[in-house]
Amino acid sequence: MAMTAAAVPSSGSFQKQDEEWRAVLSPEQFRVLRLKGTDKRGKGEFTKKFEEGTYSCAGCGTALYKSTTKFDSGCGWPAFFDAIPGAIKQTPEAGGRRMEITCAVCDGHLGHVFKGEGYSTPTDQRHCVNSVSLKFASADSSK
């Protein structure tokens, strides 16, 4: 069930035990979303996808990013310059170079935010997101 930006549930409202997650996620999705793993660089399904639509959490369906905020950073993972308001949580990592990003609803690991890298985007941020953490709904599919 995909959720729209207006239907972002409150934080932490979608908690499951590991065995419940394993029953609904692929082994790779579980490794990345629940164990904070990382996709292989350049191999993700959404790295080079620029179709109009919405990217949602593969764990709980919460809408996370609009395609209008996606850009080609050349990093090998899907890159966005901003998230749908309230959809993600950012947690500083040791050293302060990057922030871990997780789904605000199910706490699934999405990737990291890097700031100040000089991209010509409105926020000068790169949300580097694992493809396996995402599901995509084309804007055409809602017509």
Swiss-Prot record:
Enzyme class of the recorded protein, top EC level: oxidoreductase
Gene Ontology MF terms in the entry: metal ion binding; peptide-methionine (R)-S-oxide reductase activity
A Pfam family assignment: SelR
Co-factor: note: Binds 1 zinc ion per subunit.
Subcellular location(s) of the protein: Cytoplasm, Cytosol
InterPro entries: Met_Sox_Rdtase_MsrB, Met_Sox_Rdtase_MsrB_dom, Mss4-like_sf
Entries under PROSITE patterns matching the protein: MSRB
Catalytic activity: L-methionyl-[protein] + [thioredoxin]-disulfide + H2O = L-methionyl-(R)-S-oxide-[protein] + [thioredoxin]-dithiol
Any GO BP annotation: protein repair
EC number: 1.8.4.12
Superkingdom in the source lineage: Eukaryota
Catalytic residues, chain numbering: 128
Job description of the protein: Catalyzes the reduction of methionine sulfoxide (MetSO) to methionine in proteins. Plays a protective role against oxidative stress by restoring activity to proteins that have been inactivated by methionine oxidation. MSRB family specifically reduces the MetSO R-enantiomer.
Protein name: Peptide methionine sulfoxide reductase B8
Protein species of origin: Arabidopsis thaliana
